[in-house]
Design a protein with these regions (language model features):
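Catalytic glycan-binding domains that act on GlcNAc-containing polysaccharides
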Residues: 1-127
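Extracytoplasmic and endomembrane cell-envelope/extracellular-matrix remodeling and assembly machinery
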Residues: 3-6, 105-165
Length: 165
């Protein structure tokens, strides 16, 4: 993950944290309900969209998640949403459009559409408002980031300091 991230402008710590959240670093992980597979749990349609032919191939999965993250970052930035690890992970999980809709709903206090509501409910947010779900997601991401930092340190891996996190 660290090696593949060197040629991109994506923070390796973010990529490590995402792999920890999505699959606990298991490249053979599979969600039997959604069909999501691999290190970053790409669903088949997203895998195809980002050229991921074999989601169980870690190198391919890392290259695809870098492309996906860059696309998500561009959409978040264009929408005026801060581009950081927690928001990029929210965009990975909800789709960039879903993340933007969540932020807009949180700002306006408006209800969410059925698809986003269903996604929130399926991801531990049953009964939460958009704002509450975003805050829960940020806390979850930061908790996993801290755990990932500990794992990396325990493995004796030194990461370069990265701004914007």
């Amino acid at each position: 993950i660290i090696e593949e991230s060197k040629d991109s402008d994506i923070d390796p710590e973010f990529l490590l944290t995402m792999a920890n959240i999505e699959s606990t670093f298991n490249p053979n992980a599979r969600n039997k309900y959604s069909g999501a597979a691999g290190l970053y749990q790409f669903i088949p349609s997203t895998a195809r969209a980002y050229g991921l032919k074999n989601p169980y191939d870690p190198r391919q999965a890392i290259q695809a998640v870098i492309k996906f993250t860059k696309a998500n970052a561009a959409i978040l930035a264009k929408s005026g949403i801060q581009v950081n690890g927690a928001n990029l992970y929210l965009a990975h999980q909800q789709g960039a459009g879903g993340a933007v809709a969540l932020y807009r709903s949180a700002a306006r206090g408006t209800p969410l559409d059925r698809t986003i509501r269903r996604n929130i409910d399926a991801n531990g947010g049953r009964g939460l408002s958009a704002k509450q779900f975003i805050e829960m997601w940020k806390r979850n991401y930061l908790s996993k980031l801290i755990k990932t930092r500990s794992l990396v340190k325990d493995a004796g891996v030194q990461l370069e300091e990265t701004p914007n996190e």
